[in-house]
């Protein structure tokens, strides 16, 4: 089940936290609960990606993007992800979710997110997400026009460019069910 209450709590709390700008890192504290864990007693791999939504909501609210999205009747959609898991987060453990927009390619924004137990990074994800309208993906330049005081360039690190290139080489599955 989607964590609707956590999402609402994250959005409300974000309104009272320090503002962020593109390129800043946001951090929220979470605790692994019963609805997060699998039969191994750790946060399920899919749940980690779901919880990372909360970090992007926190960034969006604190950076003003969610306000722009609401005003323009836009939306926000994930277009791809790559995640690495290194350490378990078990039931009742407090952990931190760090989230940062690290760049854009003109169409998509790329987020680096990591879940940590103290100084130990447990998982790290690269998330490709875009702002969407009724007519499709909104170009990053159009989104950035809404933040005229921002000096962030959005230049992607080389490793993200390599990931984008690798993804472009991956064939899309055929529609056949065979």
Model regions and ranges:
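Short amphipathic
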Residues: 23-33
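Acidic, divalent-cation-chelating loop motifs in proteins
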Residues: 36-38
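HotDog/MaoC-like acyl-thioester-processing domains
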Residues: 1-16, 85, 89-96, 100-178
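Small beta-barrel nucleic-acid-binding modules, principally OB-folds
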Residues: 69-91
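Active-site helix/loop of acyl-thioester processing domains in fatty-acid/polyketide metabolism
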Residues: 47-74
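Short, motif-level signal for alpha-helix interfacial/capping segments enriched in acidic residues
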Residues: 15-23
């Amino acid at each position: 089940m989607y964590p609707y209450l956590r999402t609402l709590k994250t959005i409300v709390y974000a309104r009272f936290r320090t503002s962020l700008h593109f390129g800043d890192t946001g951090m929220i504290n979470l605790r692994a609960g019963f609805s997060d864990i699998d039969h191994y007693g750790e946060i399920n791999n899919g749940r980690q990606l779901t919880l990372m939504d909360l970090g992007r909501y926190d960034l969006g609210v604190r950076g003003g993007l969610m306000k722009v999205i609401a005003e323009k009747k836009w939306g926000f959609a994930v277009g791809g992800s790559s995640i690495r898991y290194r350490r378990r987060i078990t039931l009742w453990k407090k952990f931190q979710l760090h989230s940062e927009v690290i760049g854009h390619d003109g169409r998509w924004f790329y987020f680096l997110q990591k879940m940590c137990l103290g100084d130990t990074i447990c998982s790290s994800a690269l998330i490709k997400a875009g702002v969407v309208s009724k007519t499709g993906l909104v170009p990053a330049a159009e989104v950035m026009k809404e933040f005229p005081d921002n000096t962030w360039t959005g230049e992607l690190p080389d490793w993200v460019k390599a990931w984008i290139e690798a993804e472009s080489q991956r064939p899309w599955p055929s529609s056949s069910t065979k």
